[in-house]
Curated annotation (Swiss-Prot):
This is tRNA-queuosine alpha-mannosyltransferase. Glycosyltransferase that specifically catalyzes mannosylation of cytoplasmic tRNA(Asp) modified with queuosine at position 34 (queuosine(34)). Mannosylates the cyclopentene moiety of queuosine(34) in tRNA(Asp) to form mannosyl-queuosine(34). Mannosylation of queuosine(34) in tRNA(Asp) is required to slow-down elongation at cognate codons, GAC and GAU, thereby regulating protein translation. One of its GO terms (molecular function) is tRNA-queuosine(34) beta-mannosyltransferase activity. GO terms for cellular component: cytoplasm; nucleus. Its main location: cytoplasm. Keywords: Cytoplasm, Glycosyltransferase, Nucleus, Transferase. The gene is GTDC1. PANTHER family: GLYCOSYLTRANSFERASE-LIKE 1 (PTHR13615), GLYCOSYLTRANSFERASE-LIKE DOMAIN-CONTAINING PROTEIN 1 (PTHR13615:SF3). One of its GO terms (biological process) is regulation of translation.
Length: 382
Protein backbone atom coordinates (compact mmCIF):
# COMPACT_ATOMS: atom_id res chain seq x y z
CA UNK A 1 0.00 0.00 0.00
CA UNK A 2 2.18 2.83 -1.31
CA UNK A 3 -0.65 5.36 -1.81
CA UNK A 4 -2.53 6.99 1.06
CA UNK A 5 -5.94 8.36 0.03
CA UNK A 6 -7.55 10.85 2.43
CA UNK A 7 -11.02 12.30 1.94
CA UNK A 8 -12.45 14.58 4.62
CA UNK A 9 -15.84 14.82 2.90
CA UNK A 10 -16.62 11.32 1.61
CA UNK A 11 -19.73 11.89 -0.46
CA UNK A 12 -20.88 12.86 -3.96
CA UNK A 13 -18.11 13.45 -6.49
CA UNK A 14 -15.51 13.30 -3.69
CA UNK A 15 -16.59 9.73 -2.95
CA UNK A 16 -16.78 8.77 -6.62
CA UNK A 17 -13.20 9.84 -7.24
CA UNK A 18 -11.81 8.04 -4.20
CA UNK A 19 -13.77 4.88 -4.95
CA UNK A 20 -12.46 4.84 -8.52
CA UNK A 21 -8.87 5.35 -7.39
CA UNK A 22 -9.21 2.64 -4.77
CA UNK A 23 -10.70 0.25 -7.31
CA UNK A 24 -7.88 0.87 -9.78
CA UNK A 25 -5.04 0.81 -7.24
CA UNK A 26 -6.48 -2.15 -5.31
CA UNK A 27 -4.05 -3.36 -2.63
CA UNK A 28 -1.60 -0.56 -3.46
CA UNK A 29 -3.61 1.99 -1.47
CA UNK A 30 -5.33 2.62 1.84
CA UNK A 31 -8.37 4.92 2.10
CA UNK A 32 -9.18 7.08 5.15
CA UNK A 33 -12.41 9.08 5.16
CA UNK A 34 -14.87 11.18 7.11
CA UNK A 35 -18.62 11.23 6.33
CA UNK A 36 -20.04 13.94 4.06
CA UNK A 37 -21.71 16.03 6.77
CA UNK A 38 -21.06 19.51 8.17
CA UNK A 39 -18.63 20.58 5.44
CA UNK A 40 -17.25 23.60 7.27
CA UNK A 41 -16.51 21.59 10.39
CA UNK A 42 -14.72 18.95 8.33
CA UNK A 43 -12.63 21.62 6.62
CA UNK A 44 -11.59 23.08 9.97
CA UNK A 45 -11.01 19.95 12.07
CA UNK A 46 -10.31 16.99 9.74
CA UNK A 47 -6.52 17.25 10.05
CA UNK A 48 -6.65 16.69 13.80
CA UNK A 49 -8.88 13.65 13.34
CA UNK A 50 -6.66 12.08 10.68
CA UNK A 51 -3.58 12.74 12.80
CA UNK A 52 -4.96 10.16 15.24
CA UNK A 53 -6.62 7.71 12.84
CA UNK A 54 -4.31 7.35 9.82
CA UNK A 55 -2.22 4.23 10.46
CA UNK A 56 1.54 4.66 10.38
CA UNK A 57 3.37 2.79 7.64
CA UNK A 58 6.84 2.83 6.14
CA UNK A 59 5.36 1.81 2.76
CA UNK A 60 3.60 5.10 2.02
CA UNK A 61 5.04 7.00 -0.94
CA UNK A 62 2.18 9.26 -2.08
CA UNK A 63 -0.52 11.14 -0.18
CA UNK A 64 -3.57 12.06 -2.26
CA UNK A 65 -6.25 14.28 -0.69
CA UNK A 66 -8.99 16.68 -1.71
CA UNK A 67 -8.77 20.36 -0.86
CA UNK A 68 -11.30 19.98 1.97
CA UNK A 69 -8.40 18.77 4.12
CA UNK A 70 -6.01 21.33 5.60
CA UNK A 71 -2.88 19.63 4.28
CA UNK A 72 -0.54 22.04 6.06
CA UNK A 73 -1.97 21.12 9.45
CA UNK A 74 -1.79 17.38 8.77
CA UNK A 75 1.81 17.60 7.55
CA UNK A 76 2.78 19.46 10.73
CA UNK A 77 0.86 17.13 13.05
CA UNK A 78 2.18 14.00 11.32
CA UNK A 79 5.80 14.56 10.19
CA UNK A 80 5.89 11.05 8.71
CA UNK A 81 3.10 12.04 6.28
CA UNK A 82 4.70 15.40 5.57
CA UNK A 83 7.65 13.61 3.95
CA UNK A 84 5.45 11.94 1.31
CA UNK A 85 4.79 13.26 -2.20
CA UNK A 86 1.60 15.21 -1.59
CA UNK A 87 -1.06 15.59 -4.30
CA UNK A 88 -3.96 17.98 -3.64
CA UNK A 89 -7.13 17.71 -5.75
CA UNK A 90 -9.56 20.63 -6.11
CA UNK A 91 -13.19 19.72 -6.81
CA UNK A 92 -14.00 23.39 -6.16
CA UNK A 93 -12.17 26.33 -4.63
CA UNK A 94 -13.33 28.57 -1.81
CA UNK A 95 -11.91 31.76 -3.32
CA UNK A 96 -14.48 31.73 -6.13
CA UNK A 97 -17.23 29.66 -4.53
CA UNK A 98 -20.66 31.42 -4.67
CA UNK A 99 -21.72 32.93 -1.36
CA UNK A 100 -25.28 32.00 -0.39
CA UNK A 101 -26.06 35.28 1.34
CA UNK A 102 -24.59 38.76 1.03
CA UNK A 103 -22.25 38.44 3.95
CA UNK A 104 -18.51 38.39 4.53
CA UNK A 105 -16.84 35.38 2.97
CA UNK A 106 -15.50 32.77 5.40
CA UNK A 107 -11.83 33.71 5.27
CA UNK A 108 -10.51 30.64 7.07
CA UNK A 109 -11.70 28.08 4.49
CA UNK A 110 -10.04 29.88 1.59
CA UNK A 111 -6.94 30.55 3.67
CA UNK A 112 -6.65 26.83 4.47
CA UNK A 113 -6.70 25.99 0.76
CA UNK A 114 -3.91 28.47 0.04
CA UNK A 115 -1.80 26.94 2.83
CA UNK A 116 -2.49 23.44 1.49
CA UNK A 117 -1.28 24.48 -1.96
CA UNK A 118 1.95 25.84 -0.51
CA UNK A 119 2.62 22.52 1.24
CA UNK A 120 1.55 20.25 -1.65
CA UNK A 121 3.99 19.01 -4.28
CA UNK A 122 1.33 18.84 -7.00
CA UNK A 123 -2.00 20.69 -7.15
CA UNK A 124 -4.64 19.29 -9.48
CA UNK A 125 -7.85 21.03 -10.59
CA UNK A 126 -10.84 19.45 -12.32
CA UNK A 127 -11.11 22.29 -14.87
CA UNK A 128 -9.13 25.20 -16.26
CA UNK A 129 -11.76 27.60 -14.93
CA UNK A 130 -11.42 26.15 -11.44
CA UNK A 131 -7.64 26.55 -11.58
CA UNK A 132 -7.57 30.07 -13.02
CA UNK A 133 -10.35 31.40 -10.81
CA UNK A 134 -8.42 30.19 -7.77
CA UNK A 135 -4.98 31.42 -8.78
CA UNK A 136 -6.12 34.84 -9.98
CA UNK A 137 -8.15 35.39 -6.79
CA UNK A 138 -5.28 34.78 -4.35
CA UNK A 139 -3.95 38.35 -4.50
CA UNK A 140 -7.34 39.95 -3.92
CA UNK A 141 -8.17 37.42 -1.22
CA UNK A 142 -4.98 38.20 0.73
CA UNK A 143 -5.88 41.89 0.75
CA UNK A 144 -8.53 41.00 3.34
CA UNK A 145 -5.66 40.69 5.83
CA UNK A 146 -5.45 44.04 7.68
CA UNK A 147 -1.67 44.42 7.43
CA UNK A 148 1.62 42.56 6.80
CA UNK A 149 0.13 40.73 3.83
CA UNK A 150 2.08 37.93 2.09
CA UNK A 151 3.11 38.63 -1.50
CA UNK A 152 3.53 36.72 -4.77
CA UNK A 153 1.73 33.59 -3.57
CA UNK A 154 0.25 33.02 -7.02
CA UNK A 155 3.74 32.86 -8.53
CA UNK A 156 4.77 30.28 -5.94
CA UNK A 157 1.71 28.06 -6.37
CA UNK A 158 1.10 28.25 -10.14
CA UNK A 159 4.08 26.07 -11.24
CA UNK A 160 2.66 23.21 -9.15
CA UNK A 161 -0.78 23.39 -10.78
CA UNK A 162 -2.28 21.37 -13.59
CA UNK A 163 -5.72 20.41 -14.88
CA UNK A 164 -6.91 16.82 -14.68
CA UNK A 165 -10.53 16.41 -15.70
CA UNK A 166 -12.76 14.46 -13.39
CA UNK A 167 -12.86 10.79 -14.47
CA UNK A 168 -16.31 9.62 -15.50
CA UNK A 169 -17.26 5.98 -15.81
CA UNK A 170 -20.22 5.83 -18.15
CA UNK A 171 -22.77 3.02 -17.80
CA UNK A 172 -23.61 0.87 -20.81
CA UNK A 173 -26.84 2.42 -22.09
CA UNK A 174 -26.87 0.88 -25.57
CA UNK A 175 -30.13 -0.93 -24.81
CA UNK A 176 -31.87 2.46 -24.59
CA UNK A 177 -30.46 3.79 -27.87
CA UNK A 178 -32.17 3.81 -31.29
CA UNK A 179 -30.68 1.72 -34.07
CA UNK A 180 -29.33 4.68 -36.03
CA UNK A 181 -27.27 5.78 -33.02
CA UNK A 182 -25.99 2.26 -32.42
CA UNK A 183 -24.90 2.17 -36.05
CA UNK A 184 -23.09 5.47 -35.52
CA UNK A 185 -21.23 4.03 -32.54
CA UNK A 186 -20.29 0.94 -34.51
CA UNK A 187 -19.09 2.79 -37.60
CA UNK A 188 -17.51 5.95 -36.22
CA UNK A 189 -16.38 5.36 -32.64
CA UNK A 190 -15.36 1.75 -33.11
CA UNK A 191 -17.64 -0.08 -30.72
CA UNK A 192 -18.88 -3.54 -31.49
CA UNK A 193 -21.98 -5.50 -30.56
CA UNK A 194 -21.31 -8.23 -28.03
CA UNK A 195 -24.52 -10.02 -27.11
CA UNK A 196 -26.97 -7.53 -25.62
CA UNK A 197 -24.52 -4.65 -25.24
CA UNK A 198 -21.73 -2.82 -27.02
CA UNK A 199 -18.05 -2.58 -26.18
CA UNK A 200 -15.01 -0.95 -27.71
CA UNK A 201 -13.25 -3.05 -30.31
CA UNK A 202 -10.11 -4.68 -28.98
CA UNK A 203 -11.05 -4.51 -25.31
CA UNK A 204 -11.68 -7.69 -23.34
CA UNK A 205 -15.31 -8.61 -22.69
CA UNK A 206 -16.86 -7.14 -19.59
CA UNK A 207 -20.12 -7.42 -17.74
CA UNK A 208 -22.74 -4.72 -17.88
CA UNK A 209 -21.82 -1.75 -15.76
CA UNK A 210 -22.93 -1.76 -12.15
CA UNK A 211 -23.99 1.81 -12.73
CA UNK A 212 -26.57 0.59 -15.25
CA UNK A 213 -27.90 -1.83 -12.67
CA UNK A 214 -28.18 1.02 -10.21
CA UNK A 215 -29.97 3.11 -12.80
CA UNK A 216 -32.56 0.41 -13.41
CA UNK A 217 -32.94 -0.19 -9.67
CA UNK A 218 -33.62 3.50 -9.07
CA UNK A 219 -35.98 3.52 -12.02
CA UNK A 220 -38.02 0.63 -10.66
CA UNK A 221 -38.17 2.11 -7.17
CA UNK A 222 -39.26 5.41 -8.65
CA UNK A 223 -42.12 3.80 -10.57
CA UNK A 224 -43.24 1.76 -7.58
CA UNK A 225 -43.32 4.82 -5.32
CA UNK A 226 -45.41 6.75 -7.85
CA UNK A 227 -42.94 9.61 -8.17
CA UNK A 228 -42.44 9.10 -11.90
CA UNK A 229 -45.57 8.44 -13.89
CA UNK A 230 -45.71 8.15 -17.65
CA UNK A 231 -43.92 11.13 -19.11
CA UNK A 232 -44.11 12.13 -22.78
CA UNK A 233 -40.72 11.89 -24.41
CA UNK A 234 -38.95 10.49 -21.34
CA UNK A 235 -38.08 6.82 -21.64
CA UNK A 236 -35.12 6.43 -19.30
CA UNK A 237 -37.27 5.88 -16.23
CA UNK A 238 -39.71 3.39 -17.62
CA UNK A 239 -40.20 0.25 -19.73
CA UNK A 240 -37.18 -1.65 -18.43
CA UNK A 241 -37.72 -4.59 -20.74
CA UNK A 242 -38.28 -2.65 -23.97
CA UNK A 243 -36.33 -3.89 -26.96
CA UNK A 244 -38.37 -2.51 -29.86
CA UNK A 245 -41.12 0.01 -30.63
CA UNK A 246 -43.52 -2.88 -31.17
CA UNK A 247 -43.27 -4.05 -27.58
CA UNK A 248 -43.73 -0.47 -26.40
CA UNK A 249 -46.85 -0.03 -28.47
CA UNK A 250 -48.13 -3.43 -27.38
CA UNK A 251 -47.81 -2.58 -23.73
CA UNK A 252 -49.52 0.74 -24.22
CA UNK A 253 -52.40 -0.86 -26.12
CA UNK A 254 -52.76 -3.43 -23.36
CA UNK A 255 -52.86 -0.73 -20.69
CA UNK A 256 -55.42 1.25 -22.68
CA UNK A 257 -57.79 -1.68 -22.65
CA UNK A 258 -57.53 -2.14 -18.89
CA UNK A 259 -57.63 1.47 -17.67
CA UNK A 260 -60.64 3.75 -17.46
CA UNK A 261 -60.99 6.24 -20.29
CA UNK A 262 -59.87 9.69 -19.28
CA UNK A 263 -59.29 12.49 -21.83
CA UNK A 264 -56.10 13.64 -20.10
CA UNK A 265 -54.74 10.11 -19.83
CA UNK A 266 -55.62 9.34 -23.45
CA UNK A 267 -53.73 12.44 -24.57
CA UNK A 268 -50.68 11.41 -22.56
CA UNK A 269 -50.73 7.88 -24.01
CA UNK A 270 -50.84 9.21 -27.55
CA UNK A 271 -47.82 11.38 -26.83
CA UNK A 272 -45.97 8.47 -25.21
CA UNK A 273 -46.69 6.09 -28.09
CA UNK A 274 -45.57 8.64 -30.65
CA UNK A 275 -42.41 9.62 -28.82
CA UNK A 276 -41.34 6.10 -27.89
CA UNK A 277 -41.68 4.93 -31.47
CA UNK A 278 -39.68 7.92 -32.65
CA UNK A 279 -36.98 7.29 -30.07
CA UNK A 280 -36.52 3.65 -31.00
CA UNK A 281 -36.85 4.02 -34.77
CA UNK A 282 -34.94 7.28 -35.14
CA UNK A 283 -37.86 8.95 -36.97
CA UNK A 284 -38.23 12.71 -36.51
CA UNK A 285 -35.18 12.65 -34.25
CA UNK A 286 -34.38 16.32 -34.84
CA UNK A 287 -38.03 17.34 -34.57
CA UNK A 288 -38.53 16.05 -31.04
CA UNK A 289 -38.81 18.68 -28.26
CA UNK A 290 -35.67 19.91 -26.56
CA UNK A 291 -34.90 17.77 -23.51
CA UNK A 292 -33.33 19.87 -20.74
CA UNK A 293 -31.59 17.98 -17.92
CA UNK A 294 -30.60 19.44 -14.54
CA UNK A 295 -27.93 16.97 -13.34
CA UNK A 296 -26.67 18.96 -10.34
CA UNK A 297 -27.51 18.84 -6.68
CA UNK A 298 -30.14 21.43 -5.80
CA UNK A 299 -28.10 24.08 -3.98
CA UNK A 300 -27.44 27.81 -4.19
CA UNK A 301 -24.02 27.43 -5.81
CA UNK A 302 -25.65 25.87 -8.89
CA UNK A 303 -27.93 28.93 -9.34
CA UNK A 304 -31.31 27.19 -9.78
CA UNK A 305 -33.13 30.53 -10.07
CA UNK A 306 -31.41 31.32 -13.37
CA UNK A 307 -32.27 27.82 -14.57
CA UNK A 308 -35.97 28.49 -14.02
CA UNK A 309 -35.74 31.92 -15.66
CA UNK A 310 -34.52 30.16 -18.80
CA UNK A 311 -37.40 27.67 -18.65
CA UNK A 312 -39.91 30.50 -18.36
CA UNK A 313 -38.32 32.24 -21.36
CA UNK A 314 -38.72 29.04 -23.37
CA UNK A 315 -42.33 28.89 -22.28
CA UNK A 316 -42.96 32.53 -23.23
CA UNK A 317 -41.66 31.79 -26.73
CA UNK A 318 -43.96 28.74 -26.90
CA UNK A 319 -41.06 26.39 -27.58
CA UNK A 320 -41.76 22.71 -26.78
CA UNK A 321 -39.41 21.17 -24.25
CA UNK A 322 -39.11 18.49 -21.58
CA UNK A 323 -37.29 18.78 -18.26
CA UNK A 324 -35.62 16.10 -16.15
CA UNK A 325 -34.52 17.22 -12.70
CA UNK A 326 -31.88 14.95 -11.13
CA UNK A 327 -29.61 15.11 -8.11
CA UNK A 328 -30.09 15.44 -4.39
CA UNK A 329 -31.56 18.22 -2.30
CA UNK A 330 -30.93 19.40 1.23
CA UNK A 331 -32.77 21.03 4.13
CA UNK A 332 -32.71 24.57 2.75
CA UNK A 333 -34.14 24.62 -0.77
CA UNK A 334 -33.05 27.65 -2.84
CA UNK A 335 -35.11 29.07 -5.67
CA UNK A 336 -38.41 27.87 -4.18
CA UNK A 337 -40.38 30.85 -5.49
CA UNK A 338 -39.08 30.33 -9.01
CA UNK A 339 -40.08 26.67 -8.73
CA UNK A 340 -43.65 27.63 -7.84
CA UNK A 341 -43.80 30.14 -10.68
CA UNK A 342 -42.57 27.53 -13.16
CA UNK A 343 -45.06 24.94 -11.98
CA UNK A 344 -47.94 27.44 -11.96
CA UNK A 345 -47.27 28.82 -15.44
CA UNK A 346 -45.94 25.78 -17.27
CA UNK A 347 -47.99 22.87 -15.94
CA UNK A 348 -51.63 23.22 -17.06
CA UNK A 349 -52.97 20.37 -14.93
CA UNK A 350 -52.96 19.81 -11.17
CA UNK A 351 -49.41 19.29 -9.91
CA UNK A 352 -50.39 16.12 -8.08
CA UNK A 353 -50.85 14.30 -11.41
CA UNK A 354 -47.28 15.14 -12.46
CA UNK A 355 -48.37 15.09 -16.09
CA UNK A 356 -48.26 17.72 -18.78
CA UNK A 357 -48.10 17.86 -22.55
CA UNK A 358 -46.17 21.15 -22.25
CA UNK A 359 -43.63 20.58 -19.49
CA UNK A 360 -42.62 17.24 -18.02
CA UNK A 361 -40.71 17.34 -14.76
CA UNK A 362 -39.29 13.94 -13.84
CA UNK A 363 -38.46 13.84 -10.13
CA UNK A 364 -36.08 11.01 -9.26
CA UNK A 365 -34.27 12.04 -6.09
CA UNK A 366 -35.58 15.57 -5.71
CA UNK A 367 -38.65 16.87 -3.90
CA UNK A 368 -37.78 20.54 -3.77
CA UNK A 369 -40.89 21.46 -5.76
CA UNK A 370 -43.08 20.03 -3.03
CA UNK A 371 -40.89 21.57 -0.33
CA UNK A 372 -41.47 24.95 -1.92
CA UNK A 373 -45.11 24.81 -0.93
CA UNK A 374 -44.17 24.61 2.75
CA UNK A 375 -43.39 28.32 2.74
CA UNK A 376 -45.96 30.48 4.54
CA UNK A 377 -49.09 31.52 2.64
CA UNK A 378 -48.01 35.17 2.72
CA UNK A 379 -44.75 34.39 0.94
CA UNK A 380 -46.45 32.23 -1.69
CA UNK A 381 -48.15 35.20 -3.37
CA UNK A 382 -46.70 35.24 -6.89
Amino acid sequence: MSVLLIEAFYGGSHKQLMDLLQEELKEECVLCTLPAKKWHWKARTAALYFMQTVPASANYRILFASSVLNLAELAALRPDLGKLKKVLYFHENQLAYPVQKCKERDFQCGYNQVLSCLVADTVVFNSAFNMESFLTSIGKFMKLIPDHRPKDLEKIIRPKCQVLYFPVRFPDVSRFMPEHKLAHLENVIGVKRNGDFYQREGLPGQQKSRALGGLMKNSNACRESGLCETQPGLCTTQHEGLHSPLTAAGRLNKSEASESTNPCQEEDKQHVTFNLCNIWSGMDYLQRPLHVVWPHRWEHDKDPETFFKVLLKLKEQELPFHVSVLGETFTDVPGWKRCIVAVTRCVPRPWCTRRSSQLNICILHLNSFLKGFRISARDQIL
